[in-house]
Amino acid sequence: MTALDAPRGRPELSWRKPWWLVVLGLMLGFGLVQEQSKIKVNHYLQVGDAEQFWDQNAQERESWWQASAPVGRHNFYVSRATWTVFHSFSRGQLVAFKWGLSGLILLVFFILDVLLLRSTGVAERVPWLVVIYVTAGIPMLGLGFSSPGEAWYALARDMLGFLQSPLPSVMVVLVPWFLDRMASSRPGT
C-alpha cells in the first residue's frame, strides 16, 4: 500500500521506508540543539544585565566571562559556555539576535512538520498545520509586549515550546486517524 491509496485519515507509517522516523529523529535532534542555543542566549542576557558589562568591549567581556561567568542552570542544562560572537553584540543586538533565532527555529520546525506530513502520506493536511501555527502564534505575539513573570508571557512561552516540538505535526497525522478508528469501532457503523 502506498501513501496515495492509503485509506482516508490513515497515515502510512511504514517500517520498510521509515522516512517518518528519520524526520522525527531530525525534529528531536534539532529540538535539543535549538533549546541549548536559546539557553545560551538567555543566560548571556541575564549575566550581562546582572553585571552591567554592556559598555565593555568584546575583549574585556570575553576575559571577564572566562574568569568570572556564573554557571547557568536551566532544568537539566548546566553550562558556563557561551558563543564568542555574543561578546561583540550590544544588548539590543543580542535581543534582536534572539528574536531572529526564534523566528528561524520556528521556520525550521514548520518545514520539518511539513516533511513529517509528507513522509506519512498525509500532505493534504498541511492547511491544518497552518491553522495550528496561526492559532498558537496569536498568544506568542504577547512575548513582544510582556516580560517574564507575567501570565501572558508564560502562555506565549508555552505556545512557542509547543510549536518548537514534533507535537503539531504528530497531532495532525494521528488525531484524524484515531477519530476514524473510534467512529468505525462503534456498534452499527
What do these predicted ranges mean?
Residues 27-33, 133-144:
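Aromatic-anchored segments of alpha-helical transmembrane domains
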Residues 13-55:
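N-terminal signal-anchor transmembrane alpha helix
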Residues 20, 122-133:
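Membrane-interfacial loop-to-transmembrane alpha-helix junctions, especially the N-terminal start
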Residues 72-107:
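Individual transmembrane alpha-helix segments
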Residues 166-179:
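Hydrophobic cores of alpha-helical transmembrane segments in multi-pass inner/ER membrane proteins
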Residues 151-164:
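Non-cytosolic membrane-interface motifs at loop->transmembrane helix junctions
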Residues 13-14, 117-126:
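Membrane-interface helix-boundary motifs at transmembrane edges
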Residues 117, 142-153:
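Juxtamembrane "helix-exit" motif on the non-cytosolic side of transmembrane helices
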